[in-house]
């Protein structure tokens, strides 16, 4: 089992603070905010599949935004009343990594949700590398688009 210090060294300080202590990266600074390549986004801690580029949109909020997770069972929602706000925190199911928050102001035609996710909590797997990275079972989602 990986220690917290080993995890910090593997994923970096910012990703560690975001995923393990629910920190938030500054708006418009994350590598995936204005990034729209074809592929999937996985938890930087565990590698579990979270989101697809098919559901990513430009919300203008400064963080990557998705209309839904790749499958509803991949994330969990939690009440968050930190910083004097009432929000819904989003975590990865397996690792319990803090990812960001979900809001009810997303594209209406896509279900109305906006998953506002920290880039530091994610690792992008390009479509053409999914098979070699061990994510071949998810290639089929792109056939439906």
From Swiss-Prot:
<protein>
    <recommendedName>
        <fullName>Peptide methionine sulfoxide reductase MsrB</fullName>
        <ecNumber>1.8.4.12</ecNumber>
    </recommendedName>
</protein>
<feature type="active site" description="Nucleophile">
    <location>
        <position position="116"/>
    </location>
</feature>
<dbReference type="InterPro" id="IPR028427">
    <property type="entry name" value="Met_Sox_Rdtase_MsrB"/>
</dbReference>
<dbReference type="GO" id="GO:0030091">
    <property type="term" value="P:protein repair"/>
</dbReference>
<dbReference type="Pfam" id="PF01641">
    <property type="entry name" value="SelR"/>
</dbReference>
<keyword id="KW-0560">Oxidoreductase</keyword>
<dbReference type="GO" id="GO:0005737">
    <property type="term" value="C:cytoplasm"/>
</dbReference>
<dbReference type="InterPro" id="IPR011057">
    <property type="entry name" value="Mss4-like_sf"/>
</dbReference>
<comment type="similarity">
    <text>Belongs to the MsrB Met sulfoxide reductase family.</text>
</comment>
<feature type="domain" description="MsrB">
    <location>
        <begin position="4"/>
        <end position="127"/>
    </location>
</feature>
<dbReference type="GO" id="GO:0033743">
    <property type="term" value="F:peptide-methionine (R)-S-oxide reductase activity"/>
</dbReference>
<dbReference type="InterPro" id="IPR002579">
    <property type="entry name" value="Met_Sox_Rdtase_MsrB_dom"/>
</dbReference>
<dbReference type="GO" id="GO:0006979">
    <property type="term" value="P:response to oxidative stress"/>
</dbReference>
């Amino acid at each position: 089992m990986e220690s917290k210090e080993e995890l910090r060294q593997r994923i970096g300080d910012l990703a560690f603070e975001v995923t393990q202590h629910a920190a938030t990266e500054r708006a418009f600074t994350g590598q995936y905010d204005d990034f729209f390549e074809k592929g999937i986004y996985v938890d930087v801690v565990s590698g579990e599949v979270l989101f697809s580029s098919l559901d990513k949109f430009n919300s203008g909020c400064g963080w990557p935004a998705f209309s839904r997770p790749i499958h509803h069972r991949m994330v969990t929602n939690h009440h968050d009343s930190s910083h004097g706000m009432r929000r819904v925190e989003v975590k990865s199911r397996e690792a319990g990594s803090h990812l960001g928050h979900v809001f009810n102001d997303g594209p209406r035609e896509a279900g109305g949700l906006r998953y506002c996710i920290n880039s530091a909590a994610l690792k992008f797997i390009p479509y053409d590398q999914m098979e070699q990275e061990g994510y071949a079972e998810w290639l089929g989602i792109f056939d439906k688009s």
